[in-house]
Amino acid sequence: VAVKKIMKPFSTPVLAKRTYRELKLLKHLKHENVISLSDIFISPLEDIYFVTELLGTDLHRLLTSRPLEKQFIQYFLYQIMRGLKYVHSAGVVHRDLKPSNILVNENCDLKICDFGLARIQDPQMTGYVSTRYYRAPEIMLTWQKYDVEVDIWSAGCIFAEMLEGKPLFPGKDHVNQFSIITELLGTPPDDVINTIASENTLRFVKS
């Protein structure tokens, strides 16, 4: 088994909510491509331990150790999308999908993990989610109305990284990240830009 330690999860309201959210989701999500929770216990110091299945490594370690052959890329992508389909059908948005949150075992079985930032689908979402390289533009542009498409964007970034062996959008900060995306994909159309609520962000995009 694997044990995930969460130190002092009750020390702040944010940590407490995040821990409760992850525990609640892991308790109910049951799928071949989603990590399963086998047990949980609290230490005398009030640290929480999640006991899960052990897979051995993660996709980030694989990508930094060697190039992936085509058949492995296909199989990994299939399992990622299969897991996401299940998670999304349960009304959940992961919001922090990245190679280090995708576990792999010696048989190339893959499981999505770390649901600490996941949320039940809601018309209003917070923008502070997801590691920068895999963050969808609508999150960077401070949109609060987004849905499962942010996970699909992250999956696309991971797919490109598996093909190229390096991150597709390795931004140094939010501004540089958005610039790299628009250089490759172009500027969003006006009807999309005009939905941006923040005036500062709107001026930046139009510039």
UniProtKB/Swiss-Prot annotation:
Post-translational events: Dually phosphorylated on Thr-126 and Tyr-128, which activates the enzyme.
- UniProt catalytic activity: L-seryl-[protein] + ATP = O-phospho-L-seryl-[protein] + ADP + H(+); L-threonyl-[protein] + ATP = O-phospho-L-threonyl-[protein] + ADP + H(+)
Cofactor names from the entry are: Mg(2+)
Major subcellular site: cytoplasm
Q: What are the record keywords, sorted?
A: Activator, ATP-binding, Cytoplasm, Kinase, Nucleotide-binding, Nucleus, Phosphoprotein, Serine/threonine-protein kinase, Transcription, Transcription regulation, Transferase
* EC numbers: 2.7.11.24
Q: Where is the active site?
A: 96
Supply the Pfam families for this chain: Pkinase
PTM Phosphothreonine: list the residues: 126
What the record says about activity regulation is: Activated by tyrosine and threonine phosphorylation.
* Positions that bind ATP: 4
For the modification Phosphotyrosine, the affected residues are 128
> Where does motif TXY map?
126-128
InterPro entries in the record, alphabetically?
Answer: Kinase-like_dom_sf (IPR011009), MAP_kinase (IPR050117), MAP_kinase_CS (IPR003527), Prot_kinase_dom (IPR000719), Ser/Thr_kinase_AS (IPR008271)
Annotated GO CC locations: cytoplasm; nucleus
Q: Where is the Protein kinase domain?
A: 1-207
Can the keyword Lyase be found in this entry's annotation?
Answer: no
Stated role: Proline-directed serine/threonine-protein kinase involved in a signal transduction pathway that is activated by changes in the osmolarity of the extracellular environment. Controls osmotic regulation of transcription of target genes.
Comment text on domains = The TXY motif contains the threonine and tyrosine residues whose phosphorylation activates the MAP kinases.
Protein name, per record: Mitogen-activated protein kinase HOG1
| Species this protein is from | Fusarium culmorum
